[in-house]
Amino acid sequence: MKSFLETIRKPEVGRARSRQIRGTLIIMLFGFLLGVVQKRIDGNANIPSFLQSLDIANYFGRLSIWILLGTVLSVYAETPLRAGINTSLFFLSMIAGYYLYCHYVLGFLPKQYMMMWVAISFASFFLAQLCWYAKGRGPIAVLLSGGILGVLFAQTFNITRDFMYIIG
């Protein structure tokens, strides 16, 4: 199985473990800060005017941006295992920042909703390893890339009967 997967994409070796750990810690910090910023924007109607004009709250409120960030983290990792670790820790730290802000600043904690996102974050460990191979070569990499784009398009476009008038 290992030799078959290496025909799709071969893992990079040679990066020091301390650099890998430092990179993972930076990704976790970025995820935590992004979670806090997202909840701050979600929970506050009085945000700065430049953020209102960019409509950032609307973009970060959609699933497609998080799929894109997870895909980028996984595809640019050195190995499939590192892709899974970095992506799942990014999402778990983002959830931690988001719900710690909910609990300590806003005074509520939706536990069932939070547990759903935690389960999705754990699933991202395996999905990130799969996405890592999308940057490889051959028909399987093309199929994985097409699947990723298909999921992103399904999240981005409202494909209904009215959509058919736009595309012809």
Each PLM stretch: what is its role?
Residues 1-88:
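N-terminal topogenic module of multi-pass integral membrane proteins
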Residues 27-40, 66-71, 75, 91-99, ...:
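Transmembrane alpha-helical segments of multi-pass membrane transport proteins and ion-pumping complexes
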Residues 36-47, 96, 100, 160-165:
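Membrane-helix interface motif
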Residues 52-65, 110-120, 166-167:
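Structural signature of hydrophobic alpha-helical transmembrane segments
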Residues 75, 165-168:
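Membrane-helix boundary/juxtamembrane interface motif
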Residues 96-163:
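Membrane-proximal helix-loop-helix units in multi-pass membrane proteins
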